Amino acid sequence: SWIEVDTSNLRGNSSRSMVAFNNKLYISTIDEALGGNTPLLYASEDPEFYRFTEIFPEGIKLEKGKNPTGGITNMAVFNNRLYACVSKDSGIEVWRTNSSKVQANDWTLVANNGFGDLANVSVLAVGVYKNHLYVSATKKLSSALILPQGFDLIRINKNDRWQLVAGGKAYIPAKTVNGSRGESISGFK
């Protein structure tokens, strides 16, 4: 049977991702009314018995460059770290915790600017396979329905270097950290 858990203290109106990490359940939410520009991330040791606590509570001073900069739409555990994917109009970002402890002001930017294509604004799926974290990078869904544009598949290694696995030339080229956009390693465009 199902058990309802108390989520009354969670801000936002849409849950995008859940992951278990170091004996806690993490959930990210998006506040669609605010445009999803605030990282809303919560943790609980056991939501049946303990309320979720906010990782980035209102009022905390978030240091620039040390925290996700928008709504977290996908998460994965990789290399004993929590990775958070941020979908935003200025291009996808991927962040990771600096240790196995998840806390504010202790994150590293792994990728930005949509992996070198500012048209990549959404992360729809992430997964770990053979020592790499794979991330799907998609264009704005409304325009992709009118003019099919495909998606990019990226892989990130344990040193946070990323490579284009499948995808073509950038629609809106941009510089990025920890990798550079070139030919896909699979040859698929």
Q: Over which residues does each language-model region extend?
A:
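Trp- and S/T/G-rich repeat-edge/linker motifs of beta-rich repeat architectures
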Residues: S1-R16, A20, K24, I30-T73, ...
